[in-house]
């Protein structure tokens, strides 16, 4: 049966989404912790690198799916501050793959008006990769239809510490510091939807690992019992439908 689509105005733009999704409350910001690439490879008797390659392919497809639902902001946690402890060969492979991922997403971003933003440290990223990231940020900085946050060399506590350092450099009066002021020093500063509404983690792991610990205070979490390379569009539909069923109280 043909997919029935309907035109809706979301985030100021006319888009086509599945008609059944119009009845749901679509999150403005989804963050994904893509866990399980290495375990997927091991279970399929494949090298670790193949698990990561499959994961990159899935990340691109899932990004398109999420945008098709009208979600404005997607945060993809690509590489944590702790991932540097992995083998040198694996890290080098991942950094090369991130270069290709950034290049591929830039082409898509220019077509779809997606703003690419890097979350995380910049001082430890290889120069060639950092150059691609900065080029992508520069070329898409005026776009506002969608945002793709790529969290690379990112850690939630590290983000908070870096924000505190910037506060001290700007001589902010800490005695009168507000939540809004502090938020302006985080990596998500000046974004329309800096706080994730829904965080999806794959591979059955039920922990946050510190992703966006400041911004995610009232986020809804959905833990999927499948490795990231096995993630399908239907899993995103399920997560959004489950999110819509929940009643968010925001502490009230």
Regions inferred by a protein language model and the residue ranges of each:
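Flexible, compositionally biased loop and terminal segments
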Residues: 14-252
């Amino acid at each position: 049966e043909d997919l029935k689509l309907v035109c809706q105005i979301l985030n100021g733009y006319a888009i086509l989404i599945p008609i059944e999704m119009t009845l749901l409350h679509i999150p403005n910001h989804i963050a994904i912790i893509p866990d399980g690439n290495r375990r997927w490879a091991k279970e399929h008797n494949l090298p670790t690198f193949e698990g990561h390659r499959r994961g990159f392919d899935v990340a691109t497809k899932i990004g398109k799916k999420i945008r098709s639902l009208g979600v404005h902001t997607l945060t993809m946690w690509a590489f944590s501050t702790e991932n540097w402890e992995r083998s040198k060969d694996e890290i080098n492979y991942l950094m090369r793959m991130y270069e290709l991922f950034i290049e591929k997403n830039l082409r898509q971003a220019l077509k779809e008006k997606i703003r690419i933003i890097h979350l995380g440290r910049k001082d430890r990223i290889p120069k060639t990769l950092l150059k691609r990231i900065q080029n992508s940020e520069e070329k898409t900085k005026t776009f506002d239809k969608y945002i793709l946050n790529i969290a690379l060399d990112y850690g939630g506590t590290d983000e908070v510490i870096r924000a505190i350092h910037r506060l001290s450099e700007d001589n902010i009066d800490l005695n009168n510091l507000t939540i809004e002021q502090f938020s302006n020093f985080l990596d998500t500063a000046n974004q329309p939807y800096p706080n994730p509404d829904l965080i999806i983690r794959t591979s059955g792991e039920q922990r946050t690992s510190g992703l966006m610990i400041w911004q995610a205070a009232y986020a809804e979490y959905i833990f999927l019992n499948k490795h990231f390379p096995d993630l399908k569009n239907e899993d995103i539909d399920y997560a959004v439908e489950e999110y819509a069923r929940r009643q968010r109280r925001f502490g009230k």
